[in-house]
Amino acid sequence: MKIDYTVQVWQEGSQYIAHAMPLDVASSGETPELARQAVDEAVRLFLATSAEHGTLKEILEDAGYHLAAKNWRGPVWLGVEQRSCLTEV
């Protein structure tokens, strides 16, 4: 089974964070590539654990996926933007 996802990578201090969207799985590494590898492994484990518990279909549907030709298709991203908000707090 093939499940696609999009990865965002950013730096926090000396670590790089990789976030798999829309699965909401994240991991980190000392380099961007190590962070990507770590999040790929985290996604594999997350999906395997979900399948073992019988919740994979529900999790994928809640994340916006749909089943097409035996593959789960995620949302099509129209854009990724960095936004900001002014607040009184």
Set out the residue ranges of the language-model regions.
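A short, exposed loop/beta-hairpin motif centered on an aromatic-Gly-Thr core
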Residues: 23-34
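Short aromatic-glycine-(Arg/Gly/Cys) micro-motifs in beta-strand/loop hairpins
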Residues: 3-22
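Short, flexible helix/strand-to-coil boundary loops that buttress conserved ligand/catalytic motifs
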Residues: 20, 29, 60
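Short, charged, surface-exposed hinge/linker loops at domain edges
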Residues: 1-4, 33, 37-89
